[in-house]
Amino acid sequence: PVPAVASDTTHRNEHGGERQTFVIDVDGVVASLVPDNDYAMAEPLEGTIAAINRLHAAGHRIIMFTARGSATGIDWSTVTRDQFARWGLHYHELHFGKPAGDYYVDDRLISIAALQALA
């Protein structure tokens, strides 16, 4: 079962189940980490993309959230959208502006392995 989330993010999906919202990072999750943050060189992480696509197909809401460009001011939006299209990633929203950090601490964290097990 998908872990419980706050009621303001849980809705019914078209399959009759609860639609949950997954907010998913980009680099290191669906895109490979690359030297010097040259994101145009990133490769797809196909196992995670397949898991996300299964969640999307099951009616869950997928929001991609990235720190691409947050530290440098470079606009990576076209590169990122083109990559997602080329890689076949299914999502509902893409958000930039995640603060660049060394670590993120979150009370709703699930690992990539747990995400893949859910899908």
Region locations from a protein language model:
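HAD-like aspartate-dependent phosphatase fold
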Residues: P1-A119
